[in-house]
């Protein structure tokens, strides 16, 4: 039996169990999951991959998490270096607000962006993607959006737990305000990075610090409490996060270190969204966090925030970060850059 059919059969069995406990639960039959023909060949290759066999395995000691972190950083750094070379982007380490960051500069900075600055908060479920690996999304934005970007290499567990990452993002934002008008800057990130960007808005607002002119929120980890339809509908369909039993949620709870995950600084969908900057949100139809993205978009709109949603066919979680040669990747970042251009002052 093909792997995805086996996964679907497992979900069917689980659905039957749930159905016996709750008459409102629906049983979904096992069925093939074809790869769409109207997406790029690069995205087709990503879509066709099975979920990682070890998706539900994670470390159970601080040493184990640190080893996983080092391995991820080494792999991600190779990816970032190769990507920067292909896309003619320079990456320079520096320090802002006492936090290690990377200054990411395209070879073709747009004239309209000479006084603008973007701050990027990296993905990685709060525990992965640090070091030079943190620059991947910044490199893509610099190359396709023609902006200068600061990639924030925030602290992560087991070296530092909640709210250390948030503190670092806010510290860099406050430092950036010394040289730039808030209206000239935007903050963006994917997954945990998007959640941290939102939490930074809450913290800055509470401290009376000006907010940026725009936000970019990619597949945000906006709700760690498990609420959201796509946690069920896209379970075993998303071949990156795979399911709530996968790596990312335990990693986020490791970062939370016993703190209530319903706190808006960890699940920002429960925060006061009124008065936040205009925001563009990105997801895919197979993303486990599609509902988190859609629900956040609706709550932003209901709070009076100018919010735009873009959803890409067949993409699992944040697959636009996986391949810089895919036309969908370019489109994601060109859309975000265009949104920023409309909302940032020059």
Residue spans for each PLM region:
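Conserved, well-structured beta-alpha core segment at the onset of a catalytic domain
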Residues: 5, 17, 197
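Alpha/beta-hydrolase superfamily serine-hydrolase fold, recognizing
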Residues: 24-65, 85-346
